[in-house]
A protein has these predicted regions:
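P-loop NTPase Walker
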Residues: 1-83, 265
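Non-catalytic, alpha-helical, charged scaffold/linker segments
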Residues: 322-360
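ATP-hydrolysis module of ASCE/P-loop NTPase motor domains
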Residues: 82-160, 348-373
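Conserved helicase NTPase motor core
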Residues: 3-9, 17-19, 149-235
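Conserved helicase motor core of SF1/SF2 NTP-dependent helicases
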Residues: 21-26, 30-32, 38, 42, ...
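Non-catalytic, well-ordered alpha-helical scaffold segments
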Residues: 68-71, 75, 104, 108-112, ...
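Active-site catalytic microenvironments for nucleophilic, acid-base chemistry
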Residues: 38-39, 60, 80, 98, ...
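Conserved P-loop NTPase-based nucleic-acid remodeling module centered on helicase motor cores
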Residues: 51-121, 318-334
Length: 373
């Protein structure tokens, strides 16, 4: 493969820490594959953001690369121990049942505190993880009591979660990942180098795991595509532990042509970006609106419900539309919506997810809890 003048120095680098700031469509993952192929004797870990990325990466990287999510690494050490009490996510009803309380406002704060703690790099669960009073410098005596009660309950739940014998409180995936991070795993016994893609959106837990490694490190990301800051994700490209790294840039995009690149550069200039994105892909047009008779069009939404509402609107306007659902229609939780509709109408026999019936007395209670949370 013919590498560009931007990719070649990255692929040939011998630096212990490599940092690549890359624009959209500039071949971030392709460059990492090239780096791996250029270093066939290195035992490389490609740390994937999620399982779908892991699956796709396994078909791209050479045999000296192990493609894993952080959860996969943690599962081999801790997750497997909790197989008998594992769950995808903790829910309000799990917390309420475990604490034997119907104070849903308090339960919501306890759950949020636990999720914040599990997503953080912190060793101890404490006030910084309690969302309600996070920005308050001073609290009233009543607020102090509520804070103490919430933190005490969150610690009780955490202790029960990590207790292998306590099957009354389940262990979520983020829980055993937290245990793995707290153990400060040393990956140098298995790997010589770690590759991190999407470095602009690293979970603090994963960032902490990477931070403690003493092996070669290459991080690639686009600082203009931070999507998960609302979940606490951090930009590893600007982290203290990457200070002194050999820096590179990827600015040539094959995803679109010069027209889109021109508009993107105008927008990015307002963020202070001085490097220019180059559009070397297919010729593209940027218009204020789409022609009414356009046979195909794509709609992008920030939320799943936005996609579903748009699809419903299209059905109203056209009785026989043809849709392509990115990721497959099953990934949009339509079955859950159908269950909720049946539940709201008292048609319990039509609800397929029986856990919904066990967790909530009726639809009124479901709405009450949903509004609080």
């Amino acid at each position: 493969m013919q590498w560009t003048h931007e990719q070649s120095p990255i692929i040939q680098s011998k630096a212990s820490k490599i940092l690549v700031r890359a624009f959209a469509g500039t071949g971030k993952t392709t460059t990492l594959v090239g780096f791996a192929k250029a270093n066939p004797t290195l035992r490389i870990l490609y740390l994937c953001y999620n399982s779908s990325v892991e699956k796709a990466a396994k078909g791209k990287f050479p045999r000296n690369v192990v493609c894993k999510t952080a959860h996969s690494l943690a599962h081999a050490v801790y997750g497997i121990q909790y197989a008998h009490k594992k769950t995808k996510n903790l829910r309000l009803t799990d917390i309420a049942r475990g604490l034997d309380t119907q104070d849903w406002e308090l339960v919501r704060d306890v759950l949020a505190t636990l999720n914040n703690y599990m997503a953080s790099a912190d060793a101890e669960l404490g006030r910084p993880h309690f969302p309600r009073f996070r920005d308050k410098a001073f609290l009233t005596s009543a607020q102090e009591r509520f804070l103490k009660q919430g933190l005490d309950m969150a610690r009780v739940v955490w202790r029960r979660m990590v207790d292998l014998q306590d099957t009354g409180m389940l262990m979520p995936h983020d829980g055993y990942l937290k245990l793995y991070q707290l153990s400060k795993p040393d990956l140098s016994q298995r790997f010589d180098c770690m590759l991190l893609d999407e470095g602009q959106d690293i979970n603090p837990v994963i960032a902490d795991i990477a931070h403690w490694q003493r092996i070669r490190m290459a991080i690639v990301g686009d600082p203009h595509q931070q999507l998960y800051r609302f979940r606490g994700a951090e930009d590893a490209l600007n982290s203290d532990w990457m200070v002194g790294a050999e820096e590179h840039y990827l600015t040539q995009s094959w995803r679109f042509g010069p027209a889109i690149a021109h508009v993107a550069n105008i927008i990015l200039s307002y963020k202070g970006e001085t490097r220019k994105l180059q559009g070397l892909g297919p010729q593209t047009l940027v218009k204020k609106s789409l022609p009414a008779d356009l046979p195909h069009r794509t709609f992008i939404h920030r939320t799943v419900i936005g996609v579903i509402e748009n699809a419903l609107q299209r059905v109203r306007n056209n009785p026989a539309p043809k849709f392509y659902w990115v990721g497959g229609i099953d990934s949009y939780s339509l079955r859950d919506l159908e269950d909720l509709y049946a539940f709201s109408r008292g048609l319990r026999q039509n609800v397929q997810n029986k856990k919904l019936l066990r967790d909530y007395r009726d639809y009124t209670q479901y709405v009450e809890i949903a509004e609080i949370s």
